[in-house]
Amino acid sequence: MKRILVAATIGAASVVVLAPGIAHAGEAGYLARISVDYGLDIYDEREALALGYAVCDELRAGKPREVVADRMFLKVLDMTRTHADGIAFSAQRELCPETAQ
């Protein structure tokens, strides 16, 4: 599994990564999805969640998920299209499902 540290510049920049901690159901689902389904190693849960919630802020502001993912892909060094799409999808599905159409 490729180790990846993703610095995102969506709103307030954050990093994708996983450390031990307690997460709520939606948060745990988000962390599991980006780790298991999209192969991201998570070193810091708080930063990974901050990135997910930054995605949700963009979605709530009316930006389409594809646009949010494109911005991550284009702005973050070593971000793959699959990772960007996966982070945006996982955040929408698990952290802010009310933004799905």
Question: What positions do the PLM features span?
Answer:
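Amphipathic alpha-helical segments that form the core helices of the histone-fold
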Residues: 48-61
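Compact alpha-helical subdomains of small soluble proteins
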Residues: 63-101
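Cleaved targeting-peptide boundary
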Residues: 25-34
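N-terminal alpha-helical segment
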Residues: 27, 48-51, 68
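Short, surface-exposed acidic
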Residues: 39-48, 79-84
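Alpha-helix C-capping/helix-to-loop hinge sites
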Residues: 37, 41, 55-58, 75-76
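Acidic/histidine-rich, surface-exposed loop or edge segments in extracytoplasmic proteins
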Residues: 33-36, 68
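Classic N-terminal secretory signal peptides
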Residues: 1-25
